[in-house]
């Protein structure tokens, strides 16, 4: 009988630990790129939404999640809670200037994180 109680307690503890480590959160926002012209004017914005941009969310060098922006530059991704580095795959040197390049995902929360890609146009 003690063995059954012990094994049941152990199974509950393992299940509780597994649930805690898989808590997920959501990031959403818009990726903008710019400047898109050397001189910005009121009639012409300096930045524009960046469609079809892939964002890689990595932890300890391993890709944990990815998101691709829509035509309006918006993205949404669910990830396990924790800290992530963010980068673009095989982007040109200019397009690698992604900011911010580190984010934090909170368990059971949705956070808005907007990214910008510096085109280097000056």
Features from the language model and the residues they span:
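Glycine-centered loop-to-beta-strand initiation motif
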Residues: 29, 69-77, 115
